[in-house]
A protein has these predicted regions:
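Catalytic center-proximal scaffold of phosphoryl-transfer enzymes
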Residues: 45, 53-418
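Short, flexible loop/hinge motifs at secondary-structure junctions
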Residues: 1-74, 148, 282-287
Length: 418
């Protein structure tokens, strides 16, 4: 949405006699005007000399707004700008379709149904979905380092609510976020909607030759260590820290030393970012004597406490220690490459808007709704990574697709919005 500047000048003739203007400046006052334009186009049904029948709009020469007719999203009666507004509100501002139709749009004197909004969102998702293969190809290119996480969702099926999972993959270097919801086949050959099994991730990765995959310590990822031998698996130090923080907050003072040592490691990572170090320099710093001493201190504290009877510590402290011990190699594998991340926060941050949407909408009406959500959130979060407006990108994309363009690799947020 652009800011329209309207200049209001003072009428100097209204000054009292004898008054003198000492200086002049403009005071900015901001106002928002929300309204919907309803354009009525005269569409002609024409029979040509060769017998062809065609519907067409023939604009008048002085009709400055006639080009809006060419901005209609295929299969709808709204423009790309309108659809970008609706999808922005729903997926980025987490406004449910019901509240959009019954509150926001009705306040602007447009009475439309919730089903219309869902149908239009479906049409937009069909257009965006054409670009997913091109986006996936870049995200999973040879040697890529990716972060992966998942979150649960509910959807309506057969008069009851079912639980399923949406996955998120982030390639920080390529600045790409992809949400995916895949149908899989279980060990008995039965097809399942979504799910949290390793088959979902395996099928999405396919034969991609990525370099590393970072996740939390969920067993699905650990099984992949045996099946994807060429991919280095990293775990999340932030997860370990969270477990010690929880134990400390519940009274386990033994966790304090772990929190302090982990904080020092994070402090070093902040320094690398501030100094804008190269991956090679980060690799050297991560394997410096100072860093090694901190990690060895962590190891010593870990095994000293594990050597004591379990009764000497709380249950939460035991869970934190066991997590750190179990995933030690994967947690500190971030030292193997300067491009690796110390934690899995890139994927977790990308998932947060989905969790907000889940709280506001409670459940999806169908599997199709989940798939559309994955598509829209993919491009919303990728636009954030690239630093462009999703609304601007979506409008530009739909206009280019209407021209018949199929070079999808040149229509991605990082290419079309250069």
């Amino acid at each position: 949405m652009q800011v329209h500047r309207i200049i209001h000048k003072s009428d100097y003739t209204m000054l009292h006699e004898g008054s003198v203007v000492i200086s002049s400046s403009y005071r900015k006052i901001r106002n928002i005007v929300s309204h919907i334009e309803e354009h009525h186009f005269e569409v002609l049904k024409v029979k040509h000399a060769d017998g062809r029948i065609e519907s067409m709009f023939l604009p008048m020469k002085d009709d400055a707004r006639a080009d809006i007719y060419n901005e209609i999203v295929p299969g709808t009666s709204i423009t790309a700008n309108m659809l970008s507004y609706l999808t922005f509100n729903r997926f980025q501002m987490s406004t449910s379709a019901y509240r959009e139709a019954k509150n926001r749009l009705s306040d602007m004197d447009w009475n439309t149904s919730v089903q219309n909004l869902l149908n239009w969102a479906d049409k937009g998702a069909m257009q965006l979905n054409k670009l997913i293969p091109a986006l996936k190809k870049i995200a999973l290119q040879d040697g890529a380092n990716v972060n992966v996480d998942e979150t649960w969702l509910r959807y309506h099926a057969y008069n009851k609510k079912r639980k399923t999972y949406m996955w998120c993959l982030v390639n920080r270097k390529a600045r790409i976020v992809i949400f995916f919801y895949e149908d899989t086949t279980d060990d008995e050959g039965l097809q399942k909607h979504g799910g949290r099994s390793r088959n979902v991730l395996k099928e999405f990765l396919g034969d991609a030759k990525i370099k590393s995959l970072q996740s939390d310590g969920y067993n699905v990822y650990m099984y992949l260590d045996n099946e994807l031998m060429d991919i280095e698996h990293l775990c999340c130090l932030a997860h370990a820290r969270a477990k010690f923080k929880y134990a400390y907050d519940q009274g386990s003072l033994q966790a304090r030393i772990f929190l302090e040592l982990i904080a020092r490691l994070y402090g070093m990572e902040d320094t690398y970012r501030r100094e804008k170090l190269t991956p090679d320099e980060i690799y050297r710093r991560r394997n410096s004597k100072e860093t090694t001493e901190i990690i060895e201190k962590l190891r010593t504290e870990l095994y000293d406490l594990l050597a004591n009877p379990e009764e000497s510590r709380s249950e939460l402290m035991s869970k934190a220690l066991n997590y750190l011990k179990t995933f030690w190699n994967q947690i500190f594998a971030y030292r193997n490459d300067g491009e690796y991340s110390i934690d899995n926060l890139p994927a977790e941050r990308a998932l947060r808007p989905v969790t907000v949407q889940r709280k506001n909408s409670l459940f999806f009406g169908s599997v199709k709704g989940i798939q559309n959500s994955a598509i829209y959130n993919t491009f919303i979060e990728t636009c954030k990574q690239v630093g462009v407006s999703f609304r601007d990108y979506f409008c530009k994309l739909l206009k280019e697709l209407k021209k018949g363009r199929t070079d999808y690799e040149n229509l991605l947020p990082m290419t079309i919005c250069k």
